[in-house]
Amino acid sequence: MEIFASDERYVGRDMGGREVEITPAMVEQFIAGTGDDHPWYRGDSPLGGPIAPALVLHSEVYRTLEWYLPNIYGNLHVRQEWQVFAPVMVGERLTTRCVIVDRYVKRDREYVVNEALVLNSSGRLVSRSRTHQSFLVEAGPKAAGFVVDRSRERDAARSFGVGERGGEPIEAPMRKITEAMCMAFSGPARNYHTDREAAVELGFPDIVVQGMLSICLVAEMMTRRFGLGFLCGGKMDLRLVNVLWGNDTTGPRGRIVERRPEGKRTRPEVEAWCEKADGTKTVVGIASALEM
């Protein structure tokens, strides 16, 4: 006897998983989509061979959208949590599993949280992530205009005082997120992350760069600064606060604001964010790693 209807998005609903080999081609696709070309991904590393990017399976929760609520008009990725427990070598076979772990309402939006677990061939948990997706609460016909437009990010209420606590800065390059990068990261299908017309159909004026790309940029910054300390114990809790549009220039930033003891190691806590060329913040939150 089934307790829930097959189309219910309930906490505890299993969204399935897969077995996947982390191939060099998959890593090349990641590099093309993000611009993150760390030398460890293709050549020698402290572990003796190529290491996959920490977020190489960045969009595992999006392999099926059956966890989405029916009203997808104006839906947004609003928060991303990630824990990295062990490095993954290129060529490894992994097993994934996704499950809905939370559902809640705030103001005019309803949120669904999908957790992805990734295990290696020995059964070891190598990463856990939680993706918070928000959906407009249906309330009659769609309003005229866009759900989110470019002027929204200039609203004084959407300024975020990150980077003002001092601390050791972590610099990273800015890069333009081209439409080709969007297709490599979020394609090959036509959708609002790869095609302007598809974006307009969902209430946006232009291509909406997939939020996971900015999350990957923060992970790139943390990997370059902390190396194996991020790949063996990295954490991120990031909120996506403004839309990154196709062809915008962006980059991650960080400041080490605290160091805490963790066993025999030290864990630096980083105030992390992504910003556009004009200083508009698109992602804000915290990240940490182990100092090895």
Protein language model features and the residues they cover:
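A conserved acidic, glycine/proline-rich C-terminal tail/linker
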Residues: 233-237
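Hot-dog-fold acyl-thioester-processing enzymes
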Residues: 1-79, 140-232
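Short, glycine/charge-rich beta-strand/loop segments that flank catalytic centers
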Residues: 45-48, 116, 238
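HotDog/MaoC-like acyl-thioester-processing domains
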Residues: 1-10, 79, 84-169, 240, ...
